[in-house]
Design a protein with these regions (language model features):
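Multi-pass alpha-helical membrane architecture of UbiA-family
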Residues: 1-273
Length: 273
């Protein structure tokens, strides 16, 4: 069971489900748990499990080089059959719970699934395009939450801000995965333009996040609580960008993930407090 939880990246899925809830709370301006929002969060959790598992199925060869002991499929701790079952069941659960909310959420779920399934074979080998695809999908939980409660426009600002951080983080992860990607002939951004230039791009996106995280929420009417809490996320991103400009990737991914969580809390506080 522990290996399965590692395969689906359970902690990341909890963050994604929380992102769906946060999007709903931002949209309604308060903490509430309507059935539609709970179903949307379950759908988001299930679809995230599909994406993570499918990615590992496609990346077994690279993971045997990059993460031989930590990726359950590459380490032989989870069978391909179990992984396929997770993909099938997760797709079914994700679509069913989305369908219990609205047709619009089903369409959003189908769009996310489409990107997930073409990502590894078609998008990931293409510099930047794969990073953009992951950022758009991974940053979308708040939008799904806002969509679930009938106010999709309220989820756009959180989606854009989350996507910026995910985009930078994906480039960092590509830099970390460069040895395995070279082994299987994959052409990611660090391989295409060089590790140094790729990290500069990631740092640039991180630096872009800082003014965006000030201007977009201000224009969207977020309250003062957002700006106080978001300062912590902005500082974390600035530290991460500095390390990237110095050519360092250690702990940068964790810093960016922490900034996402803090940013999510800030966005909710800015509409609820």
């Amino acid at each position: 069971m522990a290996a399965v939880l590692r395969l689906i990246r359970a902690p990341n899925l909890l963050i994604a489900a929380a992102g769906v809830l946060a999007g709903g709370w931002i949209a309604v301006g308060g903490i509430a748990f309507p059935t539609e929002l709970i179903f949307a969060a379950i759908s988001g959790f299930a679809l995230g499990a599909v994406g993570n598992t499918w990615n590992d199925i496609r990346d077994v060869a690279a993971d045997r080089v990059n993460r031989p002991g930590t990726r359950p499929l590459a380490a032989g701790q989870v069978s391909r059959g179990v992984a396929d079952l997770i993909v099938f069941d997760g797709t079914l659960i994700g679509l069913v719970f989305a369908g219990l909310v609205s047709g619009a959420l089903v369409l959003a779920a189908l769009a996310a699934l489409a990107v997930m399934f073409v990502y590894s074979p078609l998008l990931k080998p293409r510099p930047l395009l794969g990073n953009v695809a992951v950022a758009v999908v991974a940053g979308s939980p708040p939008f799904h939450g806002a969509l679930a409660v009938g106010a999709p426009a309220a989820g756009v600002v959180p989606w854009v801000l989350a996507a910026l951080l995910h985009f930078a983080r994906e480039i960092v992860k590509d830099a970390e995965d460069e040895p395995g990607d070279r082994t299987i002939g994959r052409r990611t951004l660090p391989i295409a333009v060089g590790r140094r230039r790729a990290l500069v791009v990631a740092a640039g996106v991180g630096l872009l996040f800082v003014p965006a995280s000030l201007l977009l929420p201000r224009n969207a009417g977020y309250g003062g609580a957002y700006f106080l809490i978001a300062l912590l996320a902005q500082m974390a991103v600035l530290v991460a960008a500095t390390w990237l400009l110095l050519g360092k990737v250690e702990r940068v991914s964790a810093l960016l993930k922490g900034a996402m969580v803090i940013g999510l809390i800030a966005l909710v506080a800015g509409k609820v407090a």
